[in-house]
Structure formats: structure tokens, C-alpha cells
Regions:
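Bacterial Sec-dependent N-terminal signal peptides
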Residues: 1-35
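Structured C-terminal helix/loop/strand segments within mature extracytoplasmic catalytic/sensor domains
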Residues: 30-48, 228-379
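Active-site-adjacent helix/loop patches that line small-molecule binding or acyl-intermediate pockets
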Residues: 34-43, 122-252, 256
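A short, well-structured edge-of-sheet supersecondary motif
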Residues: 41-81, 338-340
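Extracytoplasmic
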Residues: 56-58, 74, 80-82, 86-90, ...
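Active-site SXXK
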Residues: 85-111, 338
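Short glycine/serine- and small hydrophobic-enriched flexible loop segments
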Residues: 97-105, 135, 139, 245-252, ...
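Short, well-structured active-site flanking segments
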Residues: 101-128
Length: 379
């Protein structure tokens, strides 16, 4: 038993050593211009905490830049669309896009048309919903848009956009999250109304990917600890590269115009971009409680004060110990699109709200974002 444990410990050490060595070799050879590898070579402890256990943290990264020929160049690290990770609230970006596309099918409806949803007396608008989604990552407006669209429409749209491996199964943090029946919505236009009746959606096939069974336990809906792996086969999924490609359609529109199949007007894209750059204060939240950098993890995950000359348009998500972000970072010298995902769950128990977000994930994202800006601008 002692010999076996020594072997396991040595194997883990060697695996970690070989991984770090591979980064150094790649950064010094054919991949020497890859800003991701250069950033991951950093001696900063915020970076090293993740790199020293990269498999455990399931780190994936994509960085896209505009080169001197005005073409998009993609740099990738550790991507594998067949390995499941939980995308959390980053799924709200495509859902927001699809909601805008759907209202375009109805000329009388726009983002400011008030609407009500079944069993709710309040009025809402698509504009306010998307602002709340992008800035505060609130689940209620996402769930309303989910009711507006339905699973079948969402998954059809994902395929239409070339997001072939992406699947959306459920609402977020609500009872009956996987209910295949959507609620009725009513839009109010002057003296008339447009009703969207309940839709009855076909059940989506479970995911067939690697790493769908995770951890050593999870907290169930009753609050009990179940001592077995958590099954993610019917959880929302968007491969990081598919999410990133959607971001490129928004932020590198000129360069990606041949691939662009977004059915949005320039005004709608401008609205969406602005929404992804708003501060909590700009949509009515107290700036002392919610600082301007509240929804930014890349660059700002460990600081609150904005840095002059940097604008970030982004969508973050974190749940079950997974943290992800897709962002467009604009400085006076560069334009960078970054998408990144990682996991921090030391005890391997899911749904217990004991994750190392503040200690490990957020500082890593902040430092990585700053490193990338520094590396890109030094070239």
C-alpha cells in the first residue's frame, strides 16, 4: 500500500512537471508567439495555482487577435469539445441573441415593447431583461427569455449558428427547470396585444460526452449529501470554442462577415455590445454595493477600481465550481477576444457552495487578463 501511494504521488508529480515543461517547450518553439503560453509561463502565484494542477482545474482558453493583415488569428489552449464543463450563465449570451432574433420575426415588437408572463402581474421589456442578464447575471430574466423561446427553438437556433455540440436543457435556479411546457407571454402594443401561447417542447437527447459524471458526491434537492458522482448529461452545454465563435461574430464583425449568420440589425448588435459593457450603476444599482467592475473577472477579478484605457464587453458565469467568461477587451493599442473556462472544487462535492472562487479562480482570471494585455501590447 505504501509503495502504491509513493508511485501515485510520483506519477502526479511527473505529470505536473511534464505539463509545465511542455508549456515551456511550446512557448520557446513553434508556438513562441502564442500569448496564452507566454502568460501561463508567468511566475505569479495567481497563475501558478492553476497551472500546477491544470487537469484538476480543467482549464481551457481561446484568445483571438487582429493581425497586421486585418485577419483574425486564434490561439488555443487545452480545448476539447468532447470533455464536458458546466457553462453556467454564459449560456445567457446566445439566449439573448436568439430573443432579439425572434422579435425580428414580429415587426410590431421591439426591445422596448412591454410584456407580461403567465402568473406574473409585472411588466417587463426585452431591453431590461438583457441588461439585467449581462450586468447582474440575474436568472429571472434569463428564465423569462427561456419561456419566450422554448427548448426546441433554442436548440434549433444553436444548430443554425453552427453551434453543433451545444445543447440547452433547462432554466436556472427555479423549480421544474427542465419543464418542457413553456409559459404564455403577452406583448402590449398600444391598444392591441400579441400573445405567444404555451409551447410543448420535445425532450432533448442526453449529452454523449466525456467527463459527464463528476466528483465524489453532490447535494440533492432535499439538501442531502449523495455519495456518488453528479450526472451532468442533461445540463446545459456550450463548448468553449462555440461560445467564443459567437463572441467573434459580435466583436470582429468586419473580419468575420463571411461567417456571420446573426439575424440582427446593426442597432441590435450595438445595443447588445453596450449592454455587455454597462456598469450596475447604469441600470439602477448602488455603486457602493456593486462596483463598476462587478461583472468583470478577466482583468478585474481581484480589484474593483477600473483601469484607464481599458473597456471590457463580456459575459461571465460561475456555478458548481466552474467559472467561465467570454470577453472583448479594447484598449488604446489592441482589440482582444478571450474565452476561458476552469473549475475550482477541491472537495469534489457539487452543489454545496464550497468552491474556491475568491481564493483561486477570480485572481487567476484577473492576472491572466492583465498578462494577455501586456503581452499583446508589447508586440
Amino acid at each position: 500500500m505504501i509503495i502504491y501511494q509513493i508511485f501515485i504521488n510520483n506519477f502526479k508529480w511527473m505529470k505536473k512537471y511534464m505539463f509545465i515543461l511542455s508549456i515551456i517547450i511550446l512557448a520557446s518553439c513553434g508556438e513562441k508567439n502564442n500569448p496564452i503560453l507566454i502568460a501561463l509561463e508567468s511566475k505569479n502565484t495567481k497563475i501558478k495555482k492553476i497551472i500546477n494542477n491544470v487537469d484538476e482545474h480543467e482549464l481551457q482558453i481561446i484568445v483571438s487577435l487582429i493581425n497586421k493583415n486585418k485577419k483574425v488569428v486564434d490561439y488555443k489552449f487545452n480545448l476539447n469539445a468532447d470533455n464536458y464543463y458546466y457553462p453556467a450563465s454564459t449560456v445567457k449570451l446566445p439566449i439573448s441573441v436568439f430573443a432579439l432574433e425572434k422579435i425580428n420575426e414580429y415587426p410590431l415588437i421591439n426591445i422596448d415593447t412591454p410584456y407580461k408572463i403567465e402568473n406574473d402581474t409585472a411588466f417587463y421589456t426585452i431591453r431590461k431583461d438583457i441588461n439585467e442578464i449581462m450586468v447582474m447575471s440575474n436568472n429571472e430574466p434569463y428564465n423569462r427569455l427561456f419561456e419566450f423561446l422554448g427548448q426546441n427553438y433554442i436548440n434549433y437556433k444553436l444548430k443554425e449558428k453552427g453551434m453543433a455540440k451545444s445543447k440547452i436543457y433547462h432554466r436556472l435556479e427555479t423549480k421544474n427547470a427542465k419543464n418542457l411546457e413553456t409559459k404564455e407571454l403577452t406583448f402590449f402594443i398600444n391598444d392591441s396585444v400579441i400573445k405567444f401561447n404555451k409551447s410543448y417542447n420535445k425532450k432533448t437527447e442526453p449529452l454523449k460526452l466525456n467527463l459527464l459524471k463528476k466528483g465524489v458526491g453532490y447535494i440533492n434537492e432535499k439538501g442531502d449529501l449523495v455519495r456518488e458522482s453528479m450526472d451532468f448529461s442533461e445540463k446545459n452545454y456550450i463548448p468553449l470554442e462555440e461560445l467564443h465563435n459567437l463572441s467573434k461574430l459580435l466583436f470582429f464583425r468586419e473580419q468575420e462577415r463571411k461567417k456571420n449568420n446573426l439575424m440582427l440589425s446593426e442597432n441590435q448588435i450595438s445595443f447588445l455590445m453596450k449592454s455587455m459593457n454597462l456598469s450596475p450603476n447604469e441600470i439602477g444599482y448602488n455603486s457602493e454595493e456593486y462596483p463598476d467592475t462587478f461583472s468583470n473577472l478577466l482583468v478585474y477579478g481581484d480589484i474593483q477600481k477600473p483601469i484607464n484605457g481599458i473597456k471590457i464587453y463580456n459575459k461571465i458565469g460561475f456555478a458548481y465550481g466552474y467559472v467561465s467568461e467570454t470577453a472583448f477587451i479594447e484598449t488604446t493599442k489592441s482589440s482582444i477576444t478571450i474565452s476561458i473556462a476552469l473549475k475550482v472544487n477541491n472537495n469534489q462535492i457539487f452543489n454545496d457552495n464550497e468552491y474556491e472562487y475568491e481564493e483561486i479562480a477570480f485572481p487567476f482570471l484577473a492576472e491572466f487578463g492583465r498578462e494577455i494585455i501586456k503581452i499583446v501590447e508589447s508586440n
